[in-house]
Amino acid sequence: MKIEPIAFESLGVRSQATLVETKDVRILIDPAVSLAPRRYGLPPHRIEVDTLVELAKKITEKAREADVLIVTHYHYDHHDPGYVVPKEIYRDKVVLVKNPESYINPSQGKVRAPKFLRAIKGLPKEISYADGKEYRFGNTRILVSHPVPHGADVRLGYVIQVFIKDGDSSVLFTSDVEGVPSEEHVKFTLDTKPNFLVIDGPLSYLVGRALTEDQLQVSVKNMERLAKSGLETMVVDHHVLRDLKYREVLSGLYDVAKSSGVKVTTAAEILGRETLQLEAKRRELFAQDNSPAKIPRNLASLLRIDQEG
């Protein structure tokens, strides 16, 4: 099994796009990418936009190679109706999506999910509401969790977690659980016992606004529990990498993982690259070069033309 992070905060954007390749099937999870519209009161920097364009192109290329595309929920860093990544990536694919009709908050259930499903209508070879289901492609098994809250409560909706097993190798993709804040989030990992875990980590940069200090500590403690559950590797990225002090936040996890023989890494590190954290460094970027930028309006069309060419 090959697990390849495509776009994450450590690579410079908001995303969790991940490619999993087994002997039987190529699976691309959450093929989307976005930027924080404001951070520290600042818009995206030119370097962030350039990085987004580069990674949107890579997602488009990887999607072209994939057999199965999975959408775990309807936030724009996890799904795209054709704004940044061309909707044509869904053509002739098996598409597994979060059920848009149950366990979903109003903004996703009434607006985003319907808009996305209308946008890709007629493109996929097959589309399936994946919540709580199991799929097989040759000897590869895809098990999807029942919906769990996007964080400590349900204000931001629900997500589905994805477990993929091929022989002795297995990976679990948590989606946006914000560092496993409850038993509901922990259970799927403990039940499936993956070798490899891709997890988003807590929203530590929003303590006092989106979560309390107590909730942050519970999330980290639960991540430490997972590190002792038989894992070999934990890719910890996405939400927690929006915090420049993420290593300090996760210090207990690093200690527990080391004593348990578990490798804790960012997406960038596992690819042998520098951890960028461009959003978290936005003030620094503007101090060095005052160059705000906007995502090109026709980016998805340009990428589609580029792929066709």
From Swiss-Prot:
InterPro entries per the UniProt record, alphabetical: Metallo-B-lactamas, RibonucZ/Hydroxyglut_hydro, UPF0173_UPF0282_UlaG_hydrolase, UPF0282_hydrls
UniProt xrefs under SMART domains: Lactamase_B
Domain of life: Archaea
HAMAP family with a match to the protein in the record: UPF0282
Family the entry assigns: Belongs to the UPF0282 family.
Protein name: UPF0282 protein Msed_0584
Organism of origin: Metallosphaera sedula (strain ATCC 51363 / DSM 5348 / JCM 9185 / NBRC 15509 / TH2)
